[in-house]
Amino acid sequence: MFFGKIKKTAISIVLAIACVMVTCGITSDPAYAADMGAVYGIYEHGTGWSGYHGDKTAVRAGNGSYVTAIRASLLGQPDGMSGTLSYQVNLSGTGWLSWQENMTPNGSTETDMPLEAVRMAFTGQLAENYDVYYSVYQNGSWTTPVKNGETAGTEGQGLRVDGLWVTVTGKGAAVPEGPNERSVDPTRPMVALTFDDGPSKFTPRILD
């Protein structure tokens, strides 16, 4: 009898707490934030770090330069939602480096070796609620956006990464349109490359 009353009292307390949580809008899962986005930067050979660029910004190295490292994080991550935006790079001559996060540089700022490919992915609850899409500028154009750990770029083909584009969407949302800037201006004359001029050690494109 005594233990029965204790059991009923405990159940009543649990129900009361549940009612308060519902009434106050408190849940066990953090709220989804539609306006969360990526923020990122590139290390441009011969120049240094670019500024921080927001979600869906196409960031490219200057003419004749290329990317040797990247860094990235998030803006607007929901309070209480676990996880980070992680990123991995393939450094020419070295291969895939370890995953990094929270604006930790990944690549090299003390070498002339370019990046050849990039991977990005969410961890924790972020991975359950969001997709991260990304593209690199390589061989004269932007690659088709890939997501969640897939490889953007090439490996072992001698092609360098010249730019980076990143965007965040809700889990399972439609595939976003990639960078739409023109890679070639047909109104500008083409420059012939002679034997004396090059190519450079790391050509930005496949030469015919």
Task: Spell out what each predicted region is.
Residues 1-6:
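N-terminal secretory signal peptides that target proteins for export/translocation
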Residues 8-10, 25, 186:
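Residues at the start of alpha-helices and the adjacent loop-to-helix junctions
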Residues 8-19:
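Sec-dependent N-terminal signal peptides
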Residues 19-20, 208:
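Hydrophobic alpha-helical membrane context
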Residues 20-35:
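Sec-dependent signal peptide cleavage junction
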Residues 34-180:
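Lectin-type carbohydrate-recognition ectodomains
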Residues 177-208:
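Active-site beta->alpha N-cap acidic-glycine motif
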